[in-house]
A protein has these predicted regions:
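Glycine-/small-residue-enriched transmembrane alpha-helix faces in small-molecule transporters
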Residues: 1-36, 143-168, 190-194, 312-320
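Transmembrane alpha-helices of multi-pass small-molecule transport proteins
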Residues: 28-79, 106-107, 158-165, 182-203, ...
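Helix-helix packing/entry segments at the starts of transmembrane helices
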Residues: 37, 93-102, 166-189, 238-278
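Specific alpha-helical transmembrane segments that line the substrate/conduction pathway
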Residues: 33-44, 84-118, 123-124, 155, ...
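C-terminal-most transmembrane helix of multi-pass membrane proteins
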Residues: 39, 230, 262, 266-320
Length: 320
């Protein structure tokens, strides 16, 4: 059990530094390029572990599995993470971190809608409390920049959807979480690479360049911009945050259960703004602090509720 908590702590720190490191790298790379690099390298870094898990289970990847990975890659990497990346660029890292941490709440709602899983009373309360916390941070009445916030919410929503489809896929195809993640990242990166290629087609690039808001999506570079000064940060994002964060998260899940592993997303809303304050010197308003506290309370309700549910019902949980 001690090992599990070590995995949770490492994963939480890696994930909590995600928005900050992405913000720091944002100056040297295009957002979509950064997304492409981190999922390509992260996915490849997780691949040996995924292949090891497959050979241990005597499994092979079939064509129909590729369809699943292409779909999860599209939702997680192309849609969710692109919105997320642009959100980090236009908004405060701390705000994006907190809003994105609400993705397990959206996942709960989707699991109810798609997998027809029942929402326990504690989970329902957690959803409501967390949404209240989000509203306090977001404070819709004082919205100066609705763009960053809308993008963060879309990213969290679609990531919640991805985790449910991923869970459904791993249950149906019997892949473990790490295998699912590695192939999702690689397929998502390939899909992004295709879209990036399209952005180099002259007529399309010209059209995008004419709109100042869309000009950054024209001629998206693949590898240019990598220098000796930012290579370490880029490696940290690819291997630390993307491969390491997810890797340790799944290790925690495999040595314990889903609710313990998901502690990662519960500690993050509190830790990420503190790191943003220390590293990026972002000002954190009183309402943000209040919202963070409420979200953490909501997460605690969900975590404690899951704990009790596990004690009453010792059935093993499906992986996220």
């Amino acid at each position: 059990m001690k090992k599990t908590y070590l995995y949770v702590i490492i994963s939480t720190f890696l994930f909590s530094s995600m928005e900050i490191s992405l913000k720091m790298a944002g100056g040297s790379f295009s957002g979509i390029q950064l997304n492409f690099l981190r999922f390509l390298v992260g996915g490849i870094a997780l691949l040996p572990f995924a292949l090891h898990a497959l050979s241990r289970e005597h499994q092979r990847i079939h064509l129909k599995d590729m369809g699943l990975f292409a779909f999860t890659g599209l939702i997680a990497v192309v849609v969710s993470m692109s919105f997320y990346q642009v959100a980090v660029e236009v908004d405060k890292a701390s705000t994006v971190a907190v809003v994105f941490s609400a993705n397990p709440i959206f996942a709960l709602i989707f699991s109810y809608l798609i997998l027809k899983e029942t929402l326990s009373r504690s989970n329902l309360i957690a959803v409501i409390v967390s949404i209240v916390g989000l509203l306090i941070i977001v404070n819709p009445t004082h919205l100066t920049d609705p763009l960053g916030l809308s993008l963060s919410i879309i990213a969290a929503l679609t990531f919640g959807l991805y985790s449910i489809i991923s869970r459904w896929g791993s249950m149906r195809h019997h892949f473990n979480g790490l295998t699912m993640t590695s192939f999702t990242f690689i397929f998502g990166a390939i899909e992004l690479a295709i879209l990036m290629g399209i952005s180099h087609i002259q007529s399309i690039a010209t059209g995008l360049l004419q709109n100042p808001k869309l000009s950054e999506f024209a001629n998206i570079p693949y590898f240019s911009g990598i220098t000796s000064s930012n290579a370490f940060l880029l490696l940290y994002i690819c291997l630390g945050v993307t491969a390491g964060g997810f890797g340790f998260y799944f290790l925690a899940m495999e040595t314990s259960n889903v609710s313990t592993a998901s502690l990662v997303f519960f500690i993050k809303p509190a830790l990420a703004p503190i790191l943003a304050l220390l590293i990026l010197h972002e000002k954190i308003t009183l309402s943000t602090w209040l919202g963070i506290i409420v979200i953490v309370i909501g997460s605690m309700i969900m975590f404690i509720g899951d704990r009790f549910a596990n004690q009453d019902n010792p059935m093993p949980h499906a992986h996220h």
